UniProtKB/Swiss-Prot annotation:
Catalytic activity: IMP + L-aspartate + GTP = N(6)-(1,2-dicarboxyethyl)-AMP + GDP + phosphate + 2 H(+)
PANTHER family documented for this protein: ADENYLOSUCCINATE SYNTHETASE
The keyword Ribonucleoprotein is assigned to this record: no
Additional remark text: Parasitic protozoa lack the de novo purine biosynthesis pathway and rely exclusively on the salvage pathway for their purine nucleotide requirements.
UniProt xrefs under SMART domains: Adenylsucc_synt
A Pfam family annotated for this UniProt entry: Adenylsucc_synt
Recorded GO CC terms: cytoplasm
Catalytic residues as annotated in Swiss-Prot or TrEMBL: 26, 54
Subunit structure comment from the entry: Homodimer.
The name this protein goes by in its record: Adenylosuccinate synthetase
Enzymatic class: ligase
């Protein structure tokens, strides 16, 4: 079954589909978003900023997207950045210019999203470097995401809508930057140069900044096909993730409604993207981590290095209790399983199917997950073992063509999670995706 022949409606009822990461990010969301955005009218982002990243290949050309939705690469697609985002405008403009063409005419920015300034990035670096010296680093991308959300919730941040009236924006800007320079003892900061740049951004973007809530609801009323692109992933959610080793936004399904302003009843289908093994960038608990040659094998074969930071990712076995916890939050309808090909060549594959208390020996209740930073001190993973396979599976065209042991592994994941696996990624290229009937 060729996935390119199928519309998003072939995998669920309704026109509004969300693609959400179900682990610690880097699950490979970009590929399925890219595939489905060809068939959608509108592609949206609702959270985060340039700390996220997708690398998409179209017509043998690679595009690194950090702020723009994947749909921007298709002429029939309108793209929306929602109010839940923090936007580093220079990075956005650079991304627009790197793609070329008149793509800005297909882009709308929420007037309620917040502007991320260079000073936010300066503060982020200062804070992370201080934590590093104390041995308490979070492992942020130093893109200024946390400090920008901090000014937002402190009610001193500047919304993108302010940029439509430059004189008003200028007064807000000077007040904010002066306050932050004093608060963080920053003496070397070129406000005049940044203001000059923002005047050009004002001229370029003033007609692209709109009331996204009204726009989105009009599109919903017109029954447009809407693809919602989640940045980061569930276990990095500010509330539900492995706090404090998380991002600063709501990365789970609730962020869609608060970050785009659409009615929760309008979402028809939630796709949970799940990597066939587990990875994590930066610090924080990782109870199935492999610090041996198998972990190195997964990292090198899967090229597990950050799209945004190029940092090596920590690798480990797939964690079923994590997926059940995320399913409780996101109500995952179907699963896109990615990078199954990376497991080829392993003699044995472990699948974490539970956690046992080190103190009592009792198994953790289904749907619960130990997210506290000291969780590894109190729980140990329970594994089920699977025989591996040697074959290269990247040329398989159907689920039935996969090696028997690969099929057994996939079916076990499906059984434990209780949501159907619809797509399986078996290689790096866009067409290395099979549909499981």
């Amino acid at each position: 079954m060729n996935i390119f022949q199928h519309d998003i409606q072939d995998v669920g009822q309704g026109n509004v589909v969300a693609i959400l990461g179900s682990q610690w990010g880097d699950e490979g969301k970009g590929k399925i978003i890219d595939i489905l955005s060809k068939h959608s009218d509108i592609t949206c982002r609702f959270n985060g900023g340039s700390n996220a990243g997708h690398t998409i290949s179209v017509n043998d050309k690679k595009y690194a997207l950090h702020l723009l939705p994947c749909g921007i690469l298709y002429e029939n697609n309108i793209c929306v950045l929602g109010n839940g985002m923090v936007v580093h405008v220079k990075s956005l403009i650079d991304e627009i210019n790197s793609i070329g063409g008149n793509i800005i005419d297909r882009l709308y920015l929420s007037d309620k999203s917040h502007i991320l300034f260079d000073i936010h990035q300066t503060i982020d670096s200062m804070q992370e470097n201080k934590k590093l010296k104390e041995g308490k680093q979070i492992g942020t991308t130093k893109r200024g995401i946390g400090p920008c959300y901090s000014t937002k919730v402190s009610r001193v941040g500047i919304r993108l809508g302010s940029l439509k009236n430059f004189e008003h924006f200028k007064s807000l800007y000077v007040k904010l930057i002066d306050n932050l320079m004093e608060l963080y003892n920053i003496s070397d900061y070129n406000k005049e140069e940044e203001l000059e740049a923002f005047y050009q951004y004002h001229l370029l973007l003033k007609d692209r900044i709109i009331d996204v809530i009204s726009f989105m609801n009009n599109q919903l009323n017109e029954k447009k096909k809407i693809l919602i692109e989640g940045a980061n992933a569930a276990m990095l959610d500010i509330d539900f993730g492995t706090y404090p080793y998380v991002t600063s936004s709501c990365t789970t399904v609730g962020g869609i409604f608060s970050g785009l302003g659409i009615n929760h009843k309008k979402l028809n289908l939630t796709v949970g993207v799940v990597k066939s093994y587990l990875t994590r960038v930066g610090c924080g608990p990782f109870m199935t981590e492999l610090t041996n040659e198998i972990g190195d094998y997964l990292r090198e074969k899967g090229y597990e290095y950050g799209t945004t930071t190029k940092r090596p990712r920590r690798c480990g076995w797939l964690d079923i209790p994590m997926l059940l916890y995320v399913k409780c939050i996101n109500s995952i309808d179907i699963i896109n399983l990615t990078k199954l090909d990376v497991l080829s060549g392993l003699k044995e594959i472990s699948l974490c199917v539970g956690y046992r208390s080190k103190a009592t020996g009792e198994l953790l209740q289904k749907g619960c997950y130990p997210v506290d930073e000291d969780a590894p001190e109190h729980y140990e993973p329970v594994y089920e073992q699977f025989e591996g396979w040697e074959e290269d599976i990247s040329n398989c065209e159907s689920f039935e063509e996969l090696p028997e042991n690969a099929r057994k592994y996939v079916l076990a994941i499906e059984k434990y999670v209780g949501s159907p696996i619809v797509w399986i990624g078996i290689g790096a290229n866009r067409n290395n995706t099979i549909m499981k009937k």
